[in-house]
């Protein structure tokens, strides 16, 4: 029984983890293999509501409200006064939900209320051509008309948990049928006076059959689970397989569609192109480590604290800059205007403003002149001649992350040290970016590719430069941190910046979606974030969202960012053309479609990421999803007519892994068997 392509619909109804007479009726599969699941509670994020002065480690008062269903039943899950440790979590073996008395300060992530039907991403389609979901009635774009009003479970591990919960409910229902007293004794459950109506004999047989099918599917998933394969990787492989099929279809529609498909596949699916072995450096070439050690000295001079400008930059338009930076806490700050008013120092101005807004200078005892020295040095190592990956982009990512960290669902969740690490990671995440891709550096045998063994080349370089600059004169903004704090911050920053490698996108998305959906189907539905792995996963996703936030910004800003990224792509394409290299996808200025690239980018990358983030922080990101959809429609309406793509040798071919190829063969065999059975049934009998 193949159920890997099934999307599980998740109903938000009233159920608590109680004995088997909780009133949950068995749920039957609907047509198309979609199964309705019932939710056991609201997804919660316990806060860290009080802080220690300069330690950066919060005192956690985890007062959590547990909201059930629509009737508002609540559980106060107390206050556990303890500090969070990155290595060991909460001390004394306590959990964030240890029951104590105290007022409720927690924030519940409420189930989505679909006031307006919104287009869903391709993640909610079937991942099997032979097992279409109810919405996959045509091979049009998955974002064209996929609308649903229920919360869908699509990650394999969460589906397994949901199926097992259905099995439990079915067994409970059978136990309440004829002879239920005997069955209750066997199940170890005392009989209760108030029971649901007992199922009839026919419905009982149907329930048994459905239960066996659920168990068969769960066993199939668990039997194929590899010992070194994480549950997040299960979802990642599924999403990659689904995206490959979507892109294969898109590549057949037109020549520009083929380019968009190739770009998305090579950029976001962690697929390395075949390249020649790099040649060793010649005697005339500089030593590779010079890329790190020979950093440019800052031209600024140290200023006394009293003389430091309000926003860290010398400008004769300080009042206009102050008015613009009033939007620092709002989504959609005009970074281009900030750059204009700050003398092309947007990163310094934005970070200086954010640090003051969050009182980080006082919390971590950072001298203002030291912060200014580091920021000016850091911004000086961003290339102003690079169209997109410059200090304006870094400032935009910093400000976007600052807003996301302040969303009501997360504003009291992370410690000051974690917030500092996230902002610092955003600040350095593209420093010294040369304006070309990792693959370009690998293909051209660059020194950076040699230094970092072709693995996240630019991301490793950004980290090395960002931390190296701390060694400059009066630049160490972390000098007053304890050794433990400094090591913890460095670990977090490394993890966050490496996660900005776009080839890791699908794995990051799968891990986040698996985390969110798994917590939804567990009995409490509480996202504890009580260990480093879970906390850094959310922070990595937050930084990744900030890095891919352009499509969710107001259209005038989004259009400027789009023009800049395309200009940078075209500059790389020109360099590749001059060097006799194959031109990378979307880098050929003669054939690339800006409009189609943005629609494809939103459909297959931005929307799946942002709708998953919106699930985590619901309902705080709903306006961003609306903006994302509006921006998509704007670019969609401006796609020029493109000639159909001929099935020539230049068509991009999608490669399947061995596992995916085996699944394809199984599906083809099943299809052939079905066809043969159909033909044999149509033969006249003799």
UniProtKB/Swiss-Prot annotation:
Catalysed conversion reaction: 3',5'-cyclic AMP + H2O = AMP + H(+)
Keywords: cAMP, Cell projection, Cilium, Hydrolase, Magnesium, Manganese, Metal-binding, Phosphoprotein, Zinc
InterPro entries: HD/PDEase_dom, PDE4_UCR, PDEase, PDEase_catalytic_dom, PDEase_catalytic_dom_sf, PDEase_CS
Co-factor remark: Binds 2 divalent metal cations per subunit. Site 1 may preferentially bind zinc ions. Binds 2 divalent metal cations per subunit. Site 2 has a preference for magnesium and/or manganese ions.
Binding site for Zn(2+) 1: 393, 429-430, 547
Active-site annotation: 389 (proton donor)
Subcellular location: Cell projection, Cilium
UniProt protein name: 3',5'-cyclic-AMP phosphodiesterase 4C
Residue ranges, compositional bias (Basic and acidic residues): 124-133
Role summary: Hydrolyzes the second messenger cAMP, which is a key regulator of many important physiological processes.
